């Protein structure tokens, strides 16, 4: 596997805590990949799921999932992640092919295999930031597949609560060049101050022409949805209590913060993209997805 950087000695991998959610998303991407009407293709996802002890028994195809498409977990929630994958794939490819960006940063990259599965231009560079243990597991699986990235890939093993900006710039990131930033599924877990610090750092490192996509939850009371079928099924079937992992602090208005600093920002519900693509989750009663928002921001180039 090309372009791998040395990793540290941390052992915080995918077998527990927030790391398990990376396996959950990988399982969802695997299920999506095998759908006849798939929104996204990730041929690596099932190998991550089957390669970890904690998830080796999880389904990677819908016809092997209890309840199939009627399952809140393997049907609706997995399709949500499939839709999210497609929308954010499109964001990155549009940033590269239409906006001319050649530098991509994946914050909290998890088991994201976009460096390997998307059709990148050869002069792109993809920086992946996550904890050492997560990246070490990812590399072990990809190495067994002899996977090669489609562009230069720079994995950076560091905790996003540490000086990740320093680690990023030390590995060749160019703050004078436009960047496409992706923060997928990370901000749910960060306290208010940590989200604000991350957004401020992205703003500081972003040259004109940069773009940012991220996901947030806007519920004022997450625990009001504790009995949502989606959360209940994830807790009972996988032992993952998402609400125990999510930060319950009030969320900052990061989109407004970006606008105040000269960015344009649009805020969407996932259901907006369900309607656009003709498939995906739709609103329902006691909906754990009701507060989810996908935000897309751009820093304009000088006229």
UniProtKB/Swiss-Prot annotation:
Belongs to the UPF0677 family. PANTHER family: S-ADENOSYL-L-METHIONINE-DEPENDENT METHYLTRANSFERASE YKTD-RELATED (PTHR43619), S-ADENOSYL-L-METHIONINE-DEPENDENT METHYLTRANSFERASES SUPERFAMILY PROTEIN (PTHR43619:SF2). It is an enzyme of class 2 (transferase). Keywords: Methyltransferase, S-adenosyl-L-methionine, Transferase. The keyword Methyltransferase applies. GO terms for molecular function: methyltransferase activity. Gene3D superfamilies: Vaccinia Virus protein VP39. Its EC number is 2.1.1.-. InterPro entries: Ppm1/Ppm2/Tcmp (IPR007213), SAM-dependent_MTases_sf (IPR029063), SAM_mthyl_Trfase_ML2640-like (IPR011610). It comes from Streptomyces coelicolor (strain ATCC BAA-471 / A3(2) / M145). GO terms for biological process: methylation. S-adenosyl-L-methionine binds at residues 130, 159-160. This is Putative S-adenosyl-L-methionine-dependent methyltransferase SCO6443. The keyword Nucleotide-binding does not apply. NCBIfam families: mthyl_TIGR00027. Exhibits S-adenosyl-L-methionine-dependent methyltransferase activity.
């Amino acid at each position: 596997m090309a372009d791998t950087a040395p990793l540290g000695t941390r052992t915080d991998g995918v077998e527990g805590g927030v790391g398990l959610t990376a396996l959950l998303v990988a399982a969802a991407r695997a299920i999506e990949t095998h759908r006849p009407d798939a929104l996204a293709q990730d041929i690596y996802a099932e190998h991550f799921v089957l390669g970890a002890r904690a998830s080796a028994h999880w389904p990677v195809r819908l016809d092997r999932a209890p309840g199939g498409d009627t399952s809140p977990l393997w049907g609706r929630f997995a399709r949500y992640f499939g839709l999210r994958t497609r929308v954010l794939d499109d964001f990155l490819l549009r940033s590269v092919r239409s906006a001319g960006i050649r530098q991509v940063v994946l914050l909290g990259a998890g088991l994201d295999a976009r460096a390997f599965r998307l059709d990148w231009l050869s002069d792109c560079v993809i920086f992946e930031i996550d904890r050492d243990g997560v990246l070490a597991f990812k590399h072990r699986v990809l190495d067994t597949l002899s996977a090669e990235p489609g562009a230069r890939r720079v994995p950076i093993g560091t905790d996003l609560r540490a000086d990740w900006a320093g680690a990023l710039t030390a590995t060749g990131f160019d703050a004078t060049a436009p960047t496409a930033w992706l923060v997928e599924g990370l901000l749910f877990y960060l306290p208010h101050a940590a989200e604000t610090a991350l957004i401020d750092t992205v703003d500081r490192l972003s040259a004109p022409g940069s773009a940012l996509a991220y996901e947030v939850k806007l519920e004022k009371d997450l625990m009001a949805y504790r009995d949502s079928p989606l959360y209940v099924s994830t807790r009972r079937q996988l032992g993952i209590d998402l609400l125990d992992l999510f930060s319950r602090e009030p969320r900052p208005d990061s989109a407004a913060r970006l606008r105040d600093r000269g960015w344009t920002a649009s805020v969407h519900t996932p259901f907006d993209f369900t309607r656009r693509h003709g498939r995906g989750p739709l609103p329902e009663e006691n909906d754990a997805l009701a507060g989810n928002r996908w935000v897309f921001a751009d820093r304009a180039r000088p006229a």
